[in-house]
């Protein structure tokens, strides 16, 4: 077995022997690093390459690592690659830091800038989600959405709302060979996102469960809007769900703080859940989240998107065909697109579009999908709507019948 490594200690490099036991002994003798408060973080980036056909014993590996490094390591991240490669990253913090060893073992999904992995802490034995953002030196700095997400999630973590995903830790790694900066965010891990859940259940969602899920989304939105934050990218993929039916909002890369006098015109929100004022490039506010919520509630019942378009023009046309073309004051005066650019469509009964929905659910969705955003249902108002008033936490047969591979 050979070892390739990078050991950065206050801009000094140190050659480590190629023997794993000797390496761990050196690591165990690094206790003195903790006493040096100037050395805030020491990064070990180690690749263990197994040149033999038989891979090393994972159980033995974890036992040795935990024994030798538990007291001096803050974070421990590992990834199994091809051909027996094991990539490990260690971070050492000064005295007083709580040791937490984490290893990475399952990919959960991909994003615009990186991947999401399932990780397990060797400190508390719990599973978390690791969002790893890869930034090349060719890029012009760190993307604004990444900085925004970290800022918002750190802000929200201090308030700890039960329906908003909690950020546990943020740290970075530098890969000098590939000239890549990795920003790692360790967050709560949930069992599914709403998109996956709806497409894997054997039958429709019961009314009581639909109310319970919707109520939790609304509570999270009310919390965000109360703290002057618009999510701006609400969609089923960003709504996480646990087996106990706990719902948590995630992915705040497009979220933005606002005030009562702030008006935005930037195009945001995944196409199918964009409100008309956003598609028409007009001014918008926090009610864009409520439009997206109306689309999502319909999708919970029907298990398919309410409005589907391949581009902005198609999306608007589909909305107008189903909801009717807006007239008079319903058409935004600041819109860059003229009203006569679209034919006059008559509205379709929402019951015909979503026959699975109850009368109260239809009324709720209709109030979320009003063209005039000043008349649209607010998150606070939604909590007192008759559709959500009786919502209570109940165990659902649907969740019990689903066999997901975790």
UniProtKB/Swiss-Prot annotation:
Pfam families, alphabetized: Pkinase (PF00069)
Organism domain of life: Eukaryota
GO MF term set: ATP binding; cyclin binding; cyclin-dependent protein serine/threonine kinase activity; metal ion binding; protein serine kinase activity; protein serine/threonine kinase activity
Gene Ontology cellular-component terms listed: cyclin D1-CDK4 complex; cyclin-dependent protein kinase holoenzyme complex; cytoplasm; nucleus
Enzyme Commission designation: 2.7.11.22
Subunit and interaction comment: Interacts with cyd-1; the interaction is likely involved in regulating cdk-4 activity.
Name of the protein in question: Cyclin-dependent kinase 4 homolog
């Amino acid at each position: 077995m050979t070892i390739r490594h990078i050991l950065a200690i206050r801009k000094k490099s140190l050659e480590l022997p190629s023997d794993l036991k000797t390496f761990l002994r050196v690591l165990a003798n690094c206790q003195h690093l903790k006493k040096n408060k100037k050395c805030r973080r020491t990064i070990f980036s180690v690749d263990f390459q197994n040149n033999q056909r038989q891979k090393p014993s994972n159980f033995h590996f974890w036992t040795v690592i935990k024994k030798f490094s538990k007291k001096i390591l803050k974070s421990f991240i590992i990834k199994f690659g091809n051909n027996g490669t094991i990539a490990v990253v260690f971070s050492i913090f000064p005295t007083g830091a709580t040791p937490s060893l984490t290893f990475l073992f399952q990919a959960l999904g991909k994003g615009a800038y990186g991947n999401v992995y399932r990780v397990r802490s060797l400190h508390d034995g719990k599973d978390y989600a690791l969002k790893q953002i890869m930034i090349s030196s060719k890029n012009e700095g760190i993307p604004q959405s990444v900085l925004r997400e970290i800022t918002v999630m750190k802000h929200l973590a201090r308030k700890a709302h039960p329906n908003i995903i909690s950020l546990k830790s943020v740290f970075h790694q530098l890969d000098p060979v590939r000239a890549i900066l990795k920003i790692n965010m360790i967050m709560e891990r949930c069992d599914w996102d709403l998109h996956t859940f709806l497409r894997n259940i054997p039958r429709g969602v019961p009314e009581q469960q639909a109310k319970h899920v919707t109520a939790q989304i609304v509570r999270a939105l009310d919390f965000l809007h109360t703290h002057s934050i618009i999510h701006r990218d609400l969609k089923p993929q960003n709504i996480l769900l646990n087996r106990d039916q706990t719902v948590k909002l995630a992915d705040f890369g497009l979220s933005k703080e606002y005030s009562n006098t702030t008006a935005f015109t930037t195009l945001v929100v995944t196409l199918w859940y964009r409100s008309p004022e956003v598609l028409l490039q007009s001014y918008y506010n926090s009610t864009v989240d409520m439009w997206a919520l109306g689309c999502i509630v319909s999708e919970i019942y029907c298990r398919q998107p309410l409005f589907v378009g391949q581009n902005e023009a198609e999306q608007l046309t589909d909305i107008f065909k189903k909801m009717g073309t807006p007239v008079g004051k319903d058409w935004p005066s600041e819109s860059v697109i003229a009203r006569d650019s679209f034919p006059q469509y008559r509205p379709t009964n929402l019951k015909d579009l979503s026959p699975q929905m109850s009368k109260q659910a239809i009324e709720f969705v209709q109030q979320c999908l009003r063209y005039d955003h000043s008349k649209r249902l607010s998150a606070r108002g939604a909590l007192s709507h008759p559709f959500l008033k009786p919502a209570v936490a109940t165990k659902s047969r649907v969740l019990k019948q689903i066999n997901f591979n975790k």
